[in-house]
Swiss-Prot record:
Function of the molecule: Removes the formyl group from the N-terminal Met of newly synthesized proteins. Requires at least a dipeptide for an efficient rate of reaction. N-terminal L-methionine is a prerequisite for activity but the enzyme has broad specificity at other positions.
Class of this enzyme: hydrolase
Annotated InterPro entries: Peptide_deformylase, Peptide_deformylase_sf
Name used for this protein in its record: Peptide deformylase
Residues noted as binding Fe cation in the record, renumbered to the chain: C130, H173, H177
Family per similarity comment: Belongs to the polypeptide deformylase family.
UniProtKB keywords: Hydrolase, Iron, Metal-binding, Protein biosynthesis
Reaction(s) this enzyme catalyzes, per UniProt: N-terminal N-formyl-L-methionyl-[peptide] + H2O = N-terminal L-methionyl-[peptide] + formate
Source species: Streptococcus pneumoniae serotype 19F (strain G54)
Known EC number: 3.5.1.88
Keyword set includes Phosphoprotein: no
Superkingdom classification of source: Bacteria
Family matches, as NCBIfam families: pept_deformyl
Amino acid sequence: MSAIERITKAAHLIDMNDIIREGNPTLRAIAEKVTFPLSDQEIILGEKMMQFLKHSQDPVMAEKMGLRGGVGLAAPQLDISKRIIAVLVPNIVEEGETPQEAYDLEAIMYNPKIVSHSVQDAALGEGEXCLSVDRNVPGYVVRHARVTVDYFDKDGEKHRIKLKGYNSIVVQHEIDHINGIMFYDRINEKDPFAVKDGLLILE
């Protein structure tokens, strides 16, 4: 049974056992574009990926299922070499406040593509991690500070979104996955915390 057949079974909930780890060649492959109309499997896969992210951010479900928290997941991380990503960034507000919207960014993207980006680069001050990497890799992961992304939804409708800050970093991380790139490829090997002129450090 293929990974997509197993994962899209009605009763299946994606867990850490479904996520492949660094060293698996699927993580280094250029994933295939999906064609429209999507297959039922491809639609269900996107929904299951989003369900996993919601479970991973729910303390009760995460503990019950042994999940690491995640804000993004790409199909290649499930050993499925397709250009499908899911992103789920919670709205962070001051303690005691309730956000109007639970999520700052919530999307299942088919064939996402960066169509333009800022000259300025940015990196998360605390570095990045990945559900497919079980070790800590310190260093600044240098990315574009702002990006414009085109993608299709499950109905084949095209969307264009402009992203900055943390949302921009998350989507770039996931698009890297469908292009066979790992986050640590973008860390300066000789000086992991090198700061070149104009680099925006996001805290």
